[in-house]
Design a protein with these regions (language model features):
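Phosphate-ester processing/binding pockets and catalytic centers
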Residues: 1-174
Length: 174
């Protein structure tokens, strides 16, 4: 099981985790590569025009991707607390898997913090040896485009949320 994770801080703090079985990864990577424009290294929704955003979101829905949206409210005092609460819920939700890999979109300012929290949460959940994690940059891992697109659409709301809705299987308020 592979879990790709990205966030958005637009409006609420959202962390989106798209879950994929290993056998689906090649086909999904081909879908992402097929969406790239000539010379484009990776997909990032905030950089795309609306027509492309619709195409990208619809392609992921059509591919059958499934994701959980973790939403941290304002009762958390700051962004780190919100991120921490989302990461803890993410680990709890996947602790029972016999083997899983979490790939987080790399934000250099958060890597050390994430690693400390993930060590703490995987130990507490008893899954330190079965739930692995790493940070990657978007251009190095094409499938980080999936949670990026879902997070962007969900945060925008309205017709964007409706469009991406079939890909969202759960919403967790933390």
């Amino acid at each position: 099981m592979h879990i790709y994770v990205d966030e958005t801080k637009q409006r609420d703090y959202l962390l989106v985790a798209s879950v994929h079985v290993s056998t689906d990864l090649t086909a999904l990577r081909q879908t992402v590569r097929g969406l790239l424009l000539p010379g484009q290294r990776y997909l990032h929704m905030k950089d795309e025009k609306d027509g492309r955003k619709r195409t990208i979101a619809q392609a992921f829905v059509d591919a059958g991707v499934q994701a959980t949206v973790y939403r941290a409210g304002s009762h958390h005092r700051n962004e780190r607390q919100r991120r921490s609460a989302c990461l803890e819920a993410l680990v709890q939700d996947h602790a029972a898997l016999t083997e899983a890999r979490i790939i987080l979109d790399e934000d250099e300012t958060m890597v050390k913090f994430d690693n400390q929290k993930l060590i703490e949460y995987t130990r507490a959940a008893g899954c330190r040896d079965t739930l692995r994690y790493e940070h990657k940059q978007s251009h190095a891992e094409a499938l980080l485009a999936v949670p990026d697109a879902i997070a962007w659409c969900w945060a925008k709301g309205g017709p964007w949320r409706t469009l991406i809705g079939p890909a969202v299987t759960a919403i967790r308020d933390v």
